[in-house]
A protein has these predicted regions:
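Active-site bordering "gate/hinge" segments
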Residues: 1-372
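C-terminal hydrophobic structural anchor segments
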Residues: 372-378
């Protein structure tokens, strides 16, 4: 007998789980992506300069990553190096996406499960696995949305608009960020930082309690970990691809243009999402992969959380439920790093360089919240 969980809620996109059961025993379980996007075919023979505008429509949640990856791929093909001001603003754009995404994942998608409710908006009335008062839970929900909103505002500030940003262009950005606007955004993030830390401390507490109740942190089968990094500190703007072995004692680093030499993509019969492997081995991406790869977050509060995480779970850590704690570390990092950038002048210097389009091949790599994203254009 096949049992379906459909539709899945609190995820990006559309999917279901098919479970094959015989006499009460689970024989197999398949995660099935049910929606064909097809953008690889839609954009064939389209003008190259449309890619940064069209490809963000692939995903409303990660539109920023597609926007920046598309621009980087064209710049690679045209042999363009954007100016320093543009790189700072693009990094801010990626940090805004990280902040907004991780706040959504932690507080809207998974915190309700840890408290035994179906929605963050029901924390105060229905939570059954907490000793907090109704008023305290109401404040948790309100503050969670406040932190998420800071990420939304940061994307708008750096990208021109929140959904489908437009500010990154081939050669740079359309303009800097005025000093007053940067100061207001910095003040909002400075106010959000202690709130984010307080919320993450609470999330950590209820996650530990969940692990103790379950007696496990979920599947802890070893895997390789894939991330786009620069050195050993976070860089969501992307530089090279880095694969850490399951034991943590070996690694491979390679540029985006060589990804087919190392990574293998295989289609599946039961899903529109395929499987990617590294030289025949299972790989994981996303937050836990990045935390396993990094030895230093580069900012003080995030570093304290990273140290706590490594002391508690080791490095590399494999348990599946640890992805969420890793997201919390990145949430704090995104706020701290954005504050640093917003403390610098962002309205001085050239926002873009002139260029002439040319035939060629380009690769654009960024580290999206869900893992490395590569745009490859010819």
């Amino acid at each position: 007998m096949t049992r379906l969980i459909f539709p899945l809620s609190r995820i990006e996109g559309h999917a279901r789980v098919a479970i094959e059961v015989q006499e009460g025993e689970v024989l197999s379980a398949e995660f099935q992506a049910t929606e064909l996007r097809g953008f690889e075919y839609l954009v064939q023979d389209a003008p190259a300069d449309q890619m940064p505008v069209v490809t963000p429509r692939i995903c409303g949640v990660c539109s920023t990553a597609h926007h920046v990856a598309a621009v980087k791929a064209l710049e690679d093909a045209y042999e363009i190096t954007p100016p320093p001001l543009a790189l700072k603003i693009r990094e801010l754009l990626m940090l805004g996406q990280l902040l907004q995404n991780q706040a959504t994942s932690l507080f809207i998608f998974t915190m309700p499960d840890r408290l035994g409710v179906s929605s963050i908006f029901q924390l105060a009335s229905d939570a059954v696995t907490t000793d907090k008062s109704e008023q305290q839970l109401t404040e948790v929900a309100t503050r969670a949305l406040q932190v998420r909103q800071a990420g939304t505002h940061l994307i708008s500030t750096a990208g021109g608009q929140f959904i489908h940003p437009v500010k990154a262009v081939v050669g740079g950005v359309t303009g800097g960020i005025p000093a007053q606007q940067a100061a207001e955004m910095r003040a909002e993030l400075e106010a959000a930082l202690p709130i984010a830390c307080e919320l993450f401390d609470y999330y950590w507490e209820i996650s530990i309690a969940l692990g103790e109740r379950l007696g496990t942190w979920g599947d802890d089968a070893p895997a390789c970990y894939l991330s786009a990094i620069a050195g050993r500190q976070p860089n969501f703007y992307g530089n090279q691809l880095y694969v850490l072995s399951s034991s943590g004692d070996a690694c491979s680093m390679f540029p985006a243009r060589d990804f087919r030499k190392y990574l293998t993509y295989e289609a599946t019969e039961y899903s529109y999402a395929g499987h990617t492997s590294f030289q025949g081995e299972v790989i994981r991406a996303n937050s836990l992969a990045r935390i396993n790869v990094l030895h230093d977050m580069g900012t003080p509060c995030a570093n304290r959380y990273l140290k706590r995480f490594n002391e508690a779970f080791g490095q590399p850590a494999h348990a599946i439920l640890l992805f969420d704690l890793a997201r919390g570390i990145e949430l704090v990092y995104a706020i701290e790093r954005a504050i640093e950038i917003l403390s610098e002048p962002l309205d001085e210097g050239d926002p873009a360089v002139p260029y002439t389009p040319q035939d060629g091949e380009g690769f654009g790599l960024v580290e999206a919240p869900r893992g490395p994203l590569i745009h490859h254009y010819t």
